[in-house]
Design a protein with these regions (language model features):
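Bacterial Sec-dependent N-terminal signal peptides
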Residues: 1-31, 240, 326-327
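Subset of outer-membrane beta-barrel
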Residues: 29-327
């Protein structure tokens, strides 16, 4: 009975956070963003690291605003490894984000520690440290005022250290809530002749999701992601996915004031998942762009011995692979 009451409480918290995200009006996103964020949580929340049943490797590529020269292109490769004591985890993120004449590459190592907060729920705290390599080649751009001193064929190369943190509260394959700050260090990019070029600010990320069992073969998986940056509009993402027979995923997403999306995924094997999404812009960019494409590939490696105290039954899966998460 107590477990059932707590389950209803978490559902209420989940929908309340969605409402809070929609009603916020003073922030926005500056980190690379993803339509399939629910399968890519480790890229922006180190608290997620180590919460999976088996080690996993994920790769994602996003081509944004097709037909627009210099539009963003993002490539991410990440690893997520739960340690043998099942209370700690390690992760590695490598993200390359291209926009116009600039390329920014993030390399970060994450660590998390988790503990039980109830019989079924766990709380994980994580931190990541690393750096961002920024390259800006102004000779590749077309500018309104080409006579500016900084545009005389100059190339900027900078390294910026990064320190981030986050928490992830979850119950395996049922629900999750998380919050994170990708980088506490907010040094801007400056030039002596033109003052500030890029003014960096803290970003806050809030995420949540729930898995509803509709029947034995169908699951409903709503989720949200809110990105907040001081002084800019909110970036709110809502998604609804349906999982059929633990193998096929179909869904839709909406980014407020920005885009609507279609999502599809397929569990190729018990250890391989591939997902795809297409965004159609609902803002004025839709007149100039044919949309955005995103593809993700995940590999669940297993621990080699088929044992995991969090998953007593392997449910017909190969011995080395535990059941993949429904998140």
């Amino acid at each position: 009975m107590q477990h059932r009451i707590s389950r209803y409480l978490y559902i209420r918290i989940f929908f309340c956070l969605i409402f809070v995200g929609i009603s916020s009006v003073v922030f926005a996103q500056k980190e690379p963003h993803y339509t399939q964020y629910m399968y890519n949580i480790g890229s922006f929340n180190p608290g997620y690291v180590g919460t999976v049943s088996t080690p996993e490797i994920a790769g994602l590529y996003r081509a944004q605003w097709l037909d627009i020269d210099g539009a963003p292109r993002t490539l991410r490769v990440g690893t997520n490894v739960p340690l043998s004591n099942e209370t700690m985890g390690l992760g590695l993120n490598v993200i390359s984000d291209q926009l116009g004449p600039s390329t920014q590459t993030y390399v970060e190592l994450a660590y998390s520690y988790q503990f039980n907060v109830s019989d079924n729920a766990k709380l994980s705290f994580g931190m990541d440290v690393g750096g961002s390599f920024l390259n800006v080649d102004f000779s590749k751009g077309t500018f309104e005022n080409p006579g500016e001193p900084i545009l005389n064929g100059q190339t900027i190369n900078r390294f910026y250290p990064t320190i981030g943190a986050g928490f992830f509260l979850y119950e395996d394959d049922i629900w999750y809530l998380g919050a994170s700050i990708p980088n506490f260090l907010t040094d801007g990019l400056y030039n002596d002749e033109v003052a500030t070029i890029v003014d960096d600010k803290l970003q806050y990320n809030f995420i949540g999701g729930y898995v509803f069992d509709v029947n034995e073969t169908l699951k409903f998986k709503p989720a949200f992601l809110v990105n907040l940056v001081s002084g800019a509009p909110v970036n709110t993402n809502l998604s609804a996915n349906f999982l059929f027979n633990d193998r096929f995923t179909l869904g839709a997403a909406y980014r407020f004031g920005n885009a609507i999306s279609g999502l599809a995924g397929f569990q190729v094997t018990s250890g391989t998942y591939i997902g795809y999404s297409y965004d159609y812009n609902t803002n004025p960019l839709g007149e100039f762009s044919s949309g955005s494409h995103e593809i993700i590939l995940k590999f669940y490696l297993g621990r080699g011995d088929g044992t995991n105290t969090n998953n007593k039954e392997l449910k017909g899966k190969p011995k080395q692979i535990d059941t993949p998460r429904f998140f």
